[in-house]
Amino acid sequence: MKFLLQIVTVSAGMVALCSCQTSPKAVDYYQLGNEMEEAAKNKRVSRTFESFIASPTYRTSRDFWRGGALREYNPAESHVEILLEMQRGRLYINGKIAMDFPVSTGTKDQHDTPCGTFRITEKKREHHSSLYGSFVDAQGDVVKSKVHSSDKAPAGSRFQGTLMEYWMRFNGAIGMHTGKIEREAESHGCVRIPPEACSILFDKLAIGSKVIVK
């Protein structure tokens, strides 16, 4: 049976806006499935995963790929791989590639994202960082951004951790969450993922699902 393989292009501006100010749009899997079935019946031209990753712009693009396996649901047999060199992530369901998406991991200094095999230990729709964020006043307006919780707060202000939606903790303080994607490793160790892709991961993975960083 043939499936339509979808590619969604996410612009830099949209990623920055969605990761910080708006809630990601929910994915309607039934609608997605119907669209894929209809496209298959119409014999539309599909792009295979192999051709997607063979593209010369694969390493630098913000495109992501979705396959027919995305309609399946089996958290016990689902896992995600984070590819540090290529700054890409891949979701597997029942041993089949379901989605490939861009990520931004930790910088290659004291904030690197450690390699290894881990398990998701916590999931939260909305999570606030306990380390990084902004100082805000009594009205909640930002006084100073991009600060560490240990920094001295200006008079009358307090620390407010950065919002990290679709949070999935897998290695101590490190987790996967929505965030700005610049196609380079630039986080404090976490794995930043575009909102739409991250919401899908949140739905398809569970506590105990495997995360492989390599």
Locate predicted features.
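Bacterial Sec-type N-terminal signal peptides, specifically the leucine/valine-rich hydrophobic h-region
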Residues: 14-17
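N-terminal pre-domains immediately preceding structured catalytic cores
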Residues: 2-5, 19-214
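Sec-dependent signal peptide hydrophobic core
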Residues: 5-12
